[in-house]
Each structure stands twice: as structure tokens, then as C-alpha cells.
Amino acid sequence: MPHKAPKSKLFRTRYVEDSDDETRGRSRNRSVEKSRSKSLTRSKSKSPKKSRSKSLDRSKNVKTTKSKNTNKSNKYTEEDSEDSEDSESDQDDDKSDNEQSDSELDDSESDDDETDDNESDNDKSKDNFENIIESKENDFRNIIFENINEKFAIGKFGDFEVIINRDNGYINATQLCKDCGKDYKNWNQNEKSREFVKKLSQYTGLSNTNLLTKIIGGNNVKLRGTYVHPIILTNIGNWISPTFAIKIGEWIEEWKKFSRKNTLKYYKELSKIELYSNNDKEKQIQLALQKSLGGKIEVRTKHGYVDLLTKDKIIEIKSYDNWKHALGQILAYGELYENKNKCIYLFDIPSKNEIANIKIILKKFGISLLCI
């Protein structure tokens, strides 16, 4: 007959086996939970403290439900506590790694922000620099290559050296004309030049004295003269040199080719060109003389159009500033009408004039002078 083990011993053996099975099961569960916790923490975990608290709650629940036998349960709880501590230690390490990773990410983002700020600052400074360059390219002061003093400098205008007022970019037109073999007074007294300055004053809102400034006196003679607005200087350059006038035409053509809008704008402005006021005045005088003397106006010849042709006279009408032009034209027409008296009619004669000298010159060519 087989020997039966005491009941208490069997119970104790079964309990130990059950306890071992449960212990192994719990160990597997803890291993799974531990690996899952690490995986979640490394990938997207934003709150390590939460994971830690859940793990602690789990370990506490296991301790409470499984402590039936005093000795075994004490042994079990000690083992479980050690495992919990290991789990907490691992989670703390993961937390530390995660916090370090977050810190590195923050530092990286901070560096990126600083880089963006630096790039933004660089872009702003670049824009400002480009604006400065652009403004200098549109300013006559950009041609300066040597300073005379704090207010005046020397620049290059075509093939000529010019004196520039550094405060406003105005150029000494008197000296420029002199260097080119011209007299600034001739340009300034020209009726078309006066009309030009008048229109420019209306366009810019600047008075004549602000468009044309005079420097009188001083030890340096070259600094004396009339300093003119850059737009006026272009007109003077056109008057001085036909080559310069051609260059202006080339620049305009290049500007037109740059954009179709520029071409349309050019022809639009061209269609709004007003007749030179002297042309109107010349026409009025022409009609008045025709009414008084009779004859025909604008008579066509191989040399041009005669202003007024009467039975005994050839009359050429011009402003005082253009009397030399009138002289050349009347001599040409005189070859075609040798039996008629040659006459020049001048208008807009200034108070300070050289009418007496002009009469002497005209008399040498058999030309009479009419004027009002």
C-alpha cells in the first residue's frame, strides 16, 4: 500500500508549485510590460512620470493580492520589490535619456531659431545695402573720385572732370561749359533754356534759385560759377555736344527695349508734348505782320520755309537769342530772291542786349533789323 504523504505536506508542495508558476507568469508579464514601457518611452512618451506611477501602482496591487502566506509572501514581495526597483531604475534611465533627448531637441530648435534670426538679419542688411547702392547709382555724387574739401569734390562726366557740390550733387555748369569751349551764359540766355528751367521748376516744385545756385567769391576760382540740378546738366550736355545727345538717345532706346510698358509709356508721353511757347509767339507775330504787310507765310523753298514773303521783302522771324540762326537762314533765302530786301524780325529782347552790335553785323550783309 503506497505511503500517503501528510496532507499538510501535499498542500505545501502544491502551493510551492503554484507559487513558482505564478512567479514565472508574473516575471513574464513584468518583462513584457517592461519592454513595452521602454518602447513607448523611447518613441513618443511625453510624460515619463505617468509611466512610473502606473508601474508603481501595478507593483502595489500585486503585493496586496498575493500576500497569503507570511514566509512565502515576504519572500515574494522582496523579490517583487527588487524587480520593481529594477523597473523603476530602468524607467528613470529612460526618463533621463528622454529628458536629455528633449534638451538636445530644444537646443537644436534654439540653434535653428538663432540661425533663422541671423539669416533674417542678413537679408535685411542685404536689402539695405542694395538700396544704398541703388540710390548711389542714381546720384551724380557716385562719379566723385577726388575730394577738394568738405563741400566740393571732383567727378567724371564723360571725358570731362566736373566740380560737384557734395551736399546736393549739383555740378558747376560754368566750369564744364568753359572746359568744353562753350559759354554758360549763352545757354542760360537762350529762350528755350529759360523755358526748360521754368517747366522743370513746375515739375519738381523747386524754385529757379534752387535749381540754379551761384557761388561767388572764394579763394579757389574753379569753385565759382553756377551749380545746376542734374536734370539741367543733362540738357546742358545735350547743348554742348551732339555726341552726348546721341548717347542720350541710345539710353532711351535701351530703356524702351527693356519692357513693352516702357515703350508704351514713351509714346504716351511723346503724344502729350506741348509746343514750345516761342513757336506760338512766332506764329502770332507772323500772322500780325502778314496782316500789316500782306504777302504769303511759310513759303517753301529748296533751303526751307520763308516765314513771310511780300512783294519786296523776305522776312525771317526769330527770338533775340536765335538771331544768328536767322542770319544764316535769311542769307540762304536771299540767293533765291535777289531782288527782294532781306529783313530779320526779333522778339523777346532782354533789357541788357547787344542790338547795336547785331545791327552792325547785319548791315554788312545788307540785312535790315526789325524788332519790338
From Swiss-Prot:
Biased composition (Basic residues): 1-12, 37-53
Ranges of Acidic residues composition bias in the record: 79-120
Superkingdom, natural source: Viruses
InterPro entries noted in UniProt: HTH_APSES_sf, KilA/APSES_HTH, KilA_N
Residue ranges, compositional bias (Basic and acidic residues): 14-36
GO MF annotation list: DNA binding
Domain KilA-N: 151-255
SMART domains: KilA-N (SM01252)
Spans traversing the lipid bilayer: none
Region (Disordered): 1-129
Protein name, per record: Putative KilA-N domain-containing protein L32
Source organism: Acanthamoeba polyphaga mimivirus (APMV)
